[in-house]
Amino acid sequence: MISQINNEERDYKLEAYDYLLDPSLIASKPSAIRHESRLMIVRNSFLEEDCLTNKFTKNLLDEFREGDLVIVNNTKVMKARLKVELENKTLVELLVLERSHECIWLCLAKPAKKLKINRKLKLKSPLAQDINLIVDGVDEETGGRFIKFPENITCLNSMNELLDKYGEIPLPPYIKNSEEESFHEKSYQTEYATNPGAVAAPTAGLHLSKSLISNLKKKGVIILPITLHVGYGTFKPIDQEDLSNLKLHKEWVSVNKEVVEEIKRIKKTDRKIIAIGTTSVRALESCYSHEINDFIPIAKYVDLVIKPGYEFKVVDGLLTNFHLPKSSLLLLVSAMIGRERLLDLYKKAIKEKFRFFSYGDAMYISPDSLLEKK
Protein backbone atom coordinates (compact mmCIF):
# COMPACT_ATOMS: atom_id res chain seq x y z
CA MET A 1 0.00 0.00 0.00
CA ILE A 2 2.82 2.42 0.91
CA SER A 3 4.52 1.67 -2.41
CA GLN A 4 1.29 2.40 -4.28
CA ILE A 5 0.88 5.72 -2.47
CA ASN A 6 4.46 6.70 -3.24
CA ASN A 7 3.95 5.88 -6.92
CA GLU A 8 0.79 7.99 -7.04
CA GLU A 9 2.65 10.87 -5.40
CA ARG A 10 5.44 10.56 -7.97
CA ASP A 11 2.84 10.82 -10.74
CA TYR A 12 2.58 14.49 -9.76
CA LYS A 13 6.33 15.20 -9.80
CA LEU A 14 7.89 16.40 -13.04
CA GLU A 15 11.19 14.59 -12.42
CA ALA A 16 9.29 11.28 -12.48
CA TYR A 17 8.79 11.76 -16.23
CA ASP A 18 12.47 11.95 -17.07
CA TYR A 19 14.42 9.30 -18.97
CA LEU A 20 17.79 8.97 -20.67
CA LEU A 21 17.94 8.87 -24.46
CA ASP A 22 20.92 8.31 -26.73
CA PRO A 23 20.93 11.33 -29.10
CA SER A 24 21.54 8.96 -32.01
CA LEU A 25 17.94 7.75 -31.59
CA ILE A 26 16.48 11.21 -32.28
CA ALA A 27 15.15 11.05 -35.84
CA SER A 28 16.36 13.84 -38.12
CA LYS A 29 14.28 12.72 -41.08
CA PRO A 30 11.14 10.61 -41.48
CA SER A 31 10.79 7.11 -42.84
CA ALA A 32 11.15 7.13 -46.64
CA ILE A 33 7.64 5.67 -46.85
CA ARG A 34 5.22 6.95 -44.23
CA HIS A 35 3.61 3.61 -43.40
CA GLU A 36 6.99 1.84 -43.17
CA SER A 37 7.90 3.52 -39.87
CA ARG A 38 8.31 1.04 -37.03
CA LEU A 39 5.39 0.47 -34.70
CA MET A 40 5.26 -0.71 -31.10
CA ILE A 41 1.87 -2.23 -30.33
CA VAL A 42 0.77 -2.23 -26.69
CA ARG A 43 -2.07 -4.65 -26.01
CA ASN A 44 -2.27 -5.18 -22.26
CA SER A 45 -0.98 -2.92 -19.51
CA PHE A 46 0.46 -5.73 -17.44
CA LEU A 47 1.68 -8.45 -19.80
CA GLU A 48 5.14 -7.83 -21.24
CA GLU A 49 4.64 -10.41 -23.97
CA ASP A 50 1.69 -8.37 -25.24
CA CYS A 51 4.05 -5.59 -26.32
CA LEU A 52 4.89 -6.18 -29.99
CA THR A 53 7.92 -4.43 -31.44
CA ASN A 54 8.33 -6.10 -34.83
CA LYS A 55 5.51 -4.25 -36.58
CA PHE A 56 5.19 -1.31 -38.95
CA THR A 57 2.59 1.43 -39.22
CA LYS A 58 0.99 -0.36 -42.16
CA ASN A 59 0.06 -3.14 -39.68
CA LEU A 60 -2.56 -0.81 -38.22
CA LEU A 61 -4.73 -2.27 -40.96
CA ASP A 62 -4.83 -5.46 -38.88
CA GLU A 63 -5.52 -3.59 -35.62
CA PHE A 64 -8.47 -1.39 -36.56
CA ARG A 65 -11.82 -3.11 -37.06
CA GLU A 66 -14.66 -2.44 -39.44
CA GLY A 67 -16.84 0.21 -37.83
CA ASP A 68 -14.11 1.64 -35.59
CA LEU A 69 -13.91 5.44 -35.59
CA VAL A 70 -10.47 6.93 -36.26
CA ILE A 71 -10.05 10.65 -35.60
CA VAL A 72 -7.32 12.65 -37.34
CA ASN A 73 -6.21 16.25 -36.82
CA ASN A 74 -6.40 18.14 -40.12
CA THR A 75 -4.44 21.19 -38.97
CA LYS A 76 -1.73 22.39 -41.35
CA VAL A 77 1.63 23.74 -40.25
CA MET A 78 2.06 27.35 -41.31
CA LYS A 79 5.39 28.59 -42.65
CA ALA A 80 5.51 30.58 -39.44
CA ARG A 81 9.26 31.22 -39.24
CA LEU A 82 10.22 34.66 -40.56
CA LYS A 83 13.63 36.26 -41.00
CA VAL A 84 13.62 40.00 -40.43
CA GLU A 85 16.28 42.69 -40.49
CA LEU A 86 16.94 45.52 -38.05
CA GLU A 87 17.99 49.02 -39.19
CA ASN A 88 21.64 48.05 -38.61
CA LYS A 89 21.22 44.96 -40.87
CA THR A 90 21.24 42.53 -37.91
CA LEU A 91 19.12 39.47 -38.69
CA VAL A 92 16.46 38.27 -36.26
CA GLU A 93 14.18 35.26 -36.52
CA LEU A 94 10.49 35.43 -35.63
CA LEU A 95 8.08 32.59 -34.97
CA VAL A 96 4.51 33.79 -35.47
CA LEU A 97 2.29 32.27 -32.77
CA GLU A 98 -1.12 33.93 -32.73
CA ARG A 99 -3.02 37.15 -33.32
CA SER A 100 -3.33 39.47 -30.33
CA HIS A 101 -5.60 42.20 -31.74
CA GLU A 102 -6.03 44.13 -34.97
CA CYS A 103 -2.76 43.67 -36.89
CA ILE A 104 -0.69 42.90 -33.77
CA TRP A 105 0.65 39.33 -33.58
CA LEU A 106 2.50 37.53 -30.80
CA CYS A 107 5.85 36.17 -31.99
CA LEU A 108 8.81 34.49 -30.40
CA ALA A 109 12.04 36.20 -31.33
CA LYS A 110 15.62 35.00 -31.57
CA PRO A 111 17.54 36.82 -30.20
CA ALA A 112 14.66 38.52 -28.35
CA LYS A 113 16.85 40.99 -26.45
CA LYS A 114 17.47 42.95 -29.65
CA LEU A 115 13.79 43.70 -30.10
CA LYS A 116 13.07 46.71 -27.91
CA ILE A 117 9.65 48.37 -28.01
CA ASN A 118 9.15 50.62 -31.08
CA ARG A 119 12.11 49.05 -32.84
CA LYS A 120 11.58 48.92 -36.59
CA LEU A 121 12.01 45.69 -38.52
CA LYS A 122 12.04 44.88 -42.19
CA LEU A 123 10.77 41.65 -43.68
CA LYS A 124 12.91 41.07 -46.73
CA SER A 125 12.17 38.83 -49.69
CA PRO A 126 13.45 38.60 -53.26
CA LEU A 127 9.84 37.93 -54.29
CA ALA A 128 8.33 41.29 -53.33
CA GLN A 129 9.00 44.72 -51.87
CA ASP A 130 10.18 44.93 -48.29
CA ILE A 131 7.51 44.87 -45.57
CA ASN A 132 7.92 47.09 -42.52
CA LEU A 133 7.13 45.81 -39.02
CA ILE A 134 7.29 47.42 -35.56
CA VAL A 135 7.85 45.94 -32.09
CA ASP A 136 4.67 46.90 -30.21
CA GLY A 137 5.25 45.26 -26.83
CA VAL A 138 6.63 42.41 -24.73
CA ASP A 139 4.66 39.35 -23.58
CA GLU A 140 5.65 38.49 -20.02
CA GLU A 141 4.28 34.94 -20.16
CA THR A 142 6.22 33.72 -23.20
CA GLY A 143 9.03 36.27 -23.38
CA GLY A 144 7.86 36.91 -26.93
CA ARG A 145 7.20 40.18 -28.72
CA PHE A 146 4.00 41.73 -29.99
CA ILE A 147 4.75 42.69 -33.58
CA LYS A 148 2.72 45.14 -35.64
CA PHE A 149 2.28 43.84 -39.17
CA PRO A 150 0.73 45.72 -42.14
CA GLU A 151 -2.86 46.84 -41.48
CA ASN A 152 -4.37 44.17 -43.74
CA ILE A 153 -2.88 41.27 -41.72
CA THR A 154 -5.76 40.98 -39.25
CA CYS A 155 -6.84 37.35 -39.50
CA LEU A 156 -5.36 33.87 -39.85
CA ASN A 157 -6.09 33.72 -43.58
CA SER A 158 -4.28 36.97 -44.39
CA MET A 159 -1.35 36.02 -42.15
CA ASN A 160 -1.11 32.62 -43.81
CA GLU A 161 -0.95 34.28 -47.24
CA LEU A 162 1.96 36.40 -46.04
CA LEU A 163 3.72 33.41 -44.48
CA ASP A 164 3.34 31.36 -47.65
CA LYS A 165 5.33 34.04 -49.49
CA TYR A 166 7.94 34.91 -46.88
CA GLY A 167 8.08 32.19 -44.25
CA GLU A 168 9.68 28.82 -43.63
CA ILE A 169 8.43 25.68 -41.88
CA PRO A 170 9.29 25.95 -38.14
CA LEU A 171 11.02 22.64 -37.45
CA PRO A 172 11.81 21.52 -33.89
CA PRO A 173 15.42 22.33 -32.89
CA TYR A 174 16.35 18.64 -32.63
CA ILE A 175 15.71 18.08 -36.35
CA LYS A 176 19.11 18.87 -37.81
CA ASN A 177 19.88 17.87 -41.37
CA SER A 178 20.76 19.37 -44.70
CA GLU A 179 17.47 18.66 -46.46
CA GLU A 180 16.03 21.40 -48.65
CA GLU A 181 13.14 23.48 -47.30
CA SER A 182 10.84 21.93 -49.92
CA PHE A 183 11.50 18.48 -48.39
CA HIS A 184 10.15 19.52 -44.99
CA GLU A 185 7.24 21.43 -46.53
CA LYS A 186 5.92 18.04 -47.62
CA SER A 187 7.31 15.61 -45.03
CA TYR A 188 6.38 17.74 -41.99
CA GLN A 189 2.71 17.86 -43.04
CA THR A 190 0.15 15.08 -42.76
CA GLU A 191 -1.44 13.82 -45.97
CA TYR A 192 -4.76 15.30 -44.85
CA ALA A 193 -3.52 18.71 -43.65
CA THR A 194 -6.09 21.19 -44.98
CA ASN A 195 -6.60 23.80 -42.26
CA PRO A 196 -3.63 26.19 -41.75
CA GLY A 197 -2.99 27.40 -38.21
CA ALA A 198 -0.39 25.20 -36.48
CA VAL A 199 3.22 26.03 -35.61
CA ALA A 200 4.11 22.35 -35.19
CA ALA A 201 2.86 19.19 -36.85
CA PRO A 202 0.51 16.67 -35.22
CA THR A 203 3.28 14.16 -35.73
CA ALA A 204 1.45 10.87 -35.20
CA GLY A 205 -0.42 11.65 -38.40
CA LEU A 206 2.84 11.71 -40.36
CA HIS A 207 2.78 7.90 -40.30
CA LEU A 208 -0.46 7.64 -42.28
CA SER A 209 0.13 7.36 -46.01
CA LYS A 210 -2.58 7.91 -48.60
CA SER A 211 -2.57 4.20 -49.40
CA LEU A 212 -2.94 3.19 -45.73
CA ILE A 213 -5.82 5.63 -45.29
CA SER A 214 -7.45 4.25 -48.43
CA ASN A 215 -7.06 0.65 -47.26
CA LEU A 216 -8.51 1.47 -43.85
CA LYS A 217 -11.56 3.03 -45.47
CA LYS A 218 -11.97 0.00 -47.74
CA LYS A 219 -11.99 -2.17 -44.62
CA GLY A 220 -14.87 -0.12 -43.24
CA VAL A 221 -12.95 1.98 -40.74
CA ILE A 222 -14.57 5.40 -40.33
CA ILE A 223 -12.05 8.26 -40.56
CA LEU A 224 -13.16 11.77 -39.60
CA PRO A 225 -11.22 15.01 -39.03
CA ILE A 226 -11.14 17.44 -36.16
CA THR A 227 -8.95 20.54 -35.92
CA LEU A 228 -6.51 21.47 -33.18
CA HIS A 229 -4.01 24.14 -34.15
CA VAL A 230 -0.84 22.97 -32.43
CA GLY A 231 0.60 25.92 -30.55
CA TYR A 232 3.85 26.97 -28.92
CA GLY A 233 2.85 25.35 -25.64
CA THR A 234 3.17 21.88 -27.14
CA PHE A 235 6.97 22.20 -27.17
CA LYS A 236 7.32 24.70 -24.31
CA PRO A 237 9.03 22.96 -21.36
CA ILE A 238 6.96 22.49 -18.20
CA ASP A 239 8.42 24.93 -15.68
CA GLN A 240 6.99 23.58 -12.41
CA GLU A 241 8.04 20.50 -10.46
CA ASP A 242 4.69 20.01 -8.70
CA LEU A 243 2.14 18.88 -11.29
CA SER A 244 -0.88 18.75 -8.99
CA ASN A 245 -2.09 22.19 -10.14
CA LEU A 246 -0.56 22.15 -13.61
CA LYS A 247 -1.93 24.64 -16.12
CA LEU A 248 -1.20 24.26 -19.82
CA HIS A 249 -1.35 26.35 -22.95
CA LYS A 250 -4.55 27.14 -24.83
CA GLU A 251 -5.03 25.78 -28.33
CA TRP A 252 -7.80 26.37 -30.86
CA VAL A 253 -10.05 23.33 -31.27
CA SER A 254 -12.93 22.61 -33.62
CA VAL A 255 -15.02 19.44 -33.36
CA ASN A 256 -18.07 19.59 -35.60
CA LYS A 257 -21.56 18.16 -35.23
CA GLU A 258 -20.88 15.22 -37.59
CA VAL A 259 -18.00 14.01 -35.41
CA VAL A 260 -20.01 14.45 -32.21
CA GLU A 261 -22.97 12.50 -33.59
CA GLU A 262 -20.61 9.71 -34.67
CA ILE A 263 -19.04 9.62 -31.20
CA LYS A 264 -22.48 9.25 -29.63
CA ARG A 265 -23.38 6.46 -32.04
CA ILE A 266 -20.11 4.56 -31.54
CA LYS A 267 -20.44 4.74 -27.74
CA LYS A 268 -23.64 2.69 -28.02
CA THR A 269 -21.80 -0.14 -29.82
CA ASP A 270 -18.77 -2.37 -29.21
CA ARG A 271 -16.67 -0.40 -31.71
CA LYS A 272 -13.81 1.83 -30.55
CA ILE A 273 -12.69 5.43 -30.99
CA ILE A 274 -9.01 5.70 -31.89
CA ALA A 275 -7.20 9.04 -31.79
CA ILE A 276 -4.34 9.70 -34.17
CA GLY A 277 -2.04 11.71 -31.94
CA THR A 278 -2.22 13.44 -28.59
CA THR A 279 -3.68 16.56 -30.21
CA SER A 280 -6.69 14.54 -31.34
CA VAL A 281 -7.05 13.22 -27.78
CA ARG A 282 -7.08 16.73 -26.34
CA ALA A 283 -9.63 17.89 -28.90
CA LEU A 284 -11.95 14.92 -28.44
CA GLU A 285 -11.87 14.99 -24.66
CA SER A 286 -12.61 18.72 -24.76
CA CYS A 287 -15.93 18.11 -26.50
CA TYR A 288 -17.29 16.29 -23.45
CA SER A 289 -19.44 18.59 -21.30
CA HIS A 290 -19.48 17.75 -17.59
CA GLU A 291 -22.41 20.14 -17.11
CA ILE A 292 -24.78 18.10 -19.27
CA ASN A 293 -22.88 14.79 -19.21
CA ASP A 294 -22.82 14.62 -23.00
CA PHE A 295 -20.70 15.34 -26.06
CA ILE A 296 -21.10 18.70 -27.79
CA PRO A 297 -19.63 20.40 -30.88
CA ILE A 298 -17.01 23.01 -30.02
CA ALA A 299 -15.06 25.76 -31.77
CA LYS A 300 -12.98 27.54 -29.15
CA TYR A 301 -9.67 27.73 -27.31
CA VAL A 302 -9.21 24.90 -24.81
CA ASP A 303 -6.71 24.43 -21.98
CA LEU A 304 -7.54 20.89 -20.91
CA VAL A 305 -4.85 19.18 -18.82
CA ILE A 306 -4.65 15.39 -19.20
CA LYS A 307 -2.39 13.72 -16.65
CA PRO A 308 -2.48 10.57 -14.49
CA GLY A 309 -5.82 10.34 -12.73
CA TYR A 310 -7.76 11.75 -15.69
CA GLU A 311 -10.82 9.71 -16.68
CA PHE A 312 -11.20 9.44 -20.45
CA LYS A 313 -14.71 10.04 -21.77
CA VAL A 314 -14.17 9.68 -25.52
CA VAL A 315 -10.91 8.03 -26.54
CA ASP A 316 -10.41 4.25 -26.43
CA GLY A 317 -7.02 3.95 -28.15
CA LEU A 318 -4.15 6.08 -29.41
CA LEU A 319 -1.49 6.17 -32.12
CA THR A 320 1.34 8.38 -30.90
CA ASN A 321 5.05 9.08 -31.24
CA PHE A 322 7.78 8.68 -28.61
CA HIS A 323 7.81 11.99 -26.75
CA LEU A 324 10.35 14.25 -25.07
CA PRO A 325 11.16 13.72 -21.38
CA LYS A 326 9.20 15.84 -18.91
CA SER A 327 6.69 16.91 -21.57
CA SER A 328 2.94 17.41 -21.29
CA LEU A 329 2.55 14.78 -24.01
CA LEU A 330 4.27 12.21 -21.79
CA LEU A 331 1.80 13.08 -19.04
CA LEU A 332 -1.13 12.51 -21.40
CA VAL A 333 0.05 9.07 -22.51
CA SER A 334 0.82 8.16 -18.89
CA ALA A 335 -2.80 8.93 -18.06
CA MET A 336 -3.80 6.20 -20.50
CA ILE A 337 -1.54 3.32 -19.46
CA GLY A 338 0.29 4.46 -16.32
CA ARG A 339 3.57 6.32 -15.89
CA GLU A 340 5.71 3.36 -14.81
CA ARG A 341 4.35 1.16 -17.58
CA LEU A 342 5.01 3.87 -20.16
CA LEU A 343 8.59 4.44 -19.00
CA ASP A 344 9.20 0.67 -19.10
CA LEU A 345 7.98 0.67 -22.70
CA TYR A 346 10.30 3.57 -23.49
CA LYS A 347 13.23 1.60 -22.06
CA LYS A 348 12.25 -1.27 -24.32
CA ALA A 349 11.99 1.07 -27.31
CA ILE A 350 15.45 2.49 -26.58
CA LYS A 351 16.92 -0.99 -26.24
CA GLU A 352 15.43 -1.99 -29.59
CA LYS A 353 16.60 1.21 -31.31
CA PHE A 354 13.24 2.79 -32.05
CA ARG A 355 13.54 6.36 -33.34
CA PHE A 356 12.20 9.16 -31.16
CA PHE A 357 10.34 12.47 -31.43
CA SER A 358 8.65 14.21 -34.38
CA TYR A 359 10.14 12.25 -37.29
CA GLY A 360 10.49 9.07 -35.24
CA ASP A 361 8.60 5.80 -34.94
CA ALA A 362 5.17 5.18 -33.43
CA MET A 363 3.41 3.47 -30.55
CA TYR A 364 -0.13 2.13 -30.82
CA ILE A 365 -1.93 1.95 -27.49
CA SER A 366 -4.75 -0.49 -28.15
CA PRO A 367 -8.10 -0.24 -26.34
CA ASP A 368 -7.43 -3.27 -24.11
CA SER A 369 -4.21 -1.72 -22.79
CA LEU A 370 -5.84 1.30 -21.14
CA LEU A 371 -6.00 1.53 -17.38
CA GLU A 372 -9.35 0.48 -15.97
CA LYS A 373 -11.60 3.35 -15.01
CA LYS A 374 -11.89 3.81 -11.27
Curated annotation (Swiss-Prot):
Q: Which reaction does it catalyse?
A: 7-aminomethyl-7-carbaguanosine(34) in tRNA + S-adenosyl-L-methionine = epoxyqueuosine(34) in tRNA + adenine + L-methionine + 2 H(+)
Q: In which pathway does it act?
A: tRNA modification; tRNA-queuosine biosynthesis
Q: Does the keyword Nucleus apply?
A: no
Which terms does the UniProt entry file under GO BP? queuosine biosynthetic process; tRNA wobble guanine modification
Cysteine disulfide partners in this protein: none
Enzyme nomenclature, EC number: 2.4.99.17
Kindly list the places in or outside the cell where this protein is found, as annotated in its UniProt entry. Answer: Cytoplasm
Q: Enzyme class, one word?
A: transferase
- Alphabetized SUPFAM superfamilies for the sequence: QueA-like
Q: Which InterPro entries does this entry report, sorted A to Z?
A: QueA (IPR003699), QueA_dom1 (IPR042118), QueA_dom2 (IPR042119), QueA_sf (IPR036100)
* Membrane-crossing segments per the record: none
The GO terms describing molecular function are:
S-adenosylmethionine:tRNA ribosyltransferase-isomerase activity
Provide one Gene Ontology cellular component.
Answer: cytoplasm
Keywords assigned? Cytoplasm, Queuosine biosynthesis, S-adenosyl-L-methionine, Transferase
The answer to whether the entry has keyword Transferase is yes
What job does this protein perform? Answer: Transfers and isomerizes the ribose moiety from AdoMet to the 7-aminomethyl group of 7-deazaguanine (preQ1-tRNA) to give epoxyqueuosine (oQ-tRNA).
Report the sequence similarity comment from the record: Belongs to the QueA family.
User: Subunit notes for this chain?
Assistant: Monomer.
Which NCBIfam families has this protein been placed in?
PRK00147.1, queA
Protein name as annotated: S-adenosylmethionine:tRNA ribosyltransferase-isomerase
Query: What is the organism field in this record?
Result: Prochlorococcus marinus (strain MIT 9301)
Gene name as annotated = queA
